[in-house]
Amino acid sequence: MVKRKANHVINGMNDAKSQGKGAGYIENDQLVLTEEERQNNKKRKTNQ
């Protein structure tokens, strides 16, 4: 039997293009968070 490509496969699905360069990192190192924003960040990380 000949292997056929499935119709539902989308080309490039395994490429991480949507994440872009440096995904997940803050590029601006001088970004200063207030104490309240730091607490919020900790809460968000535990929920993910």
Curated annotation (Swiss-Prot):
Family, per entry: Belongs to the SspO family.
Gene name as annotated: sspO
Lineage summary: Bacteria, Bacillati, Bacillota, Bacilli, Bacillales
Presence of the UniProt keyword Iron in the record: no
Annotated compartments: Spore core
InterPro entries documented for this protein: SASP_SspO
One annotated Gene Ontology cellular component of this protein: endospore-forming forespore
Name recorded for this polypeptide: Small, acid-soluble spore protein O
Biological process according to GO: asexual sporulation; sporulation resulting in formation of a cellular spore
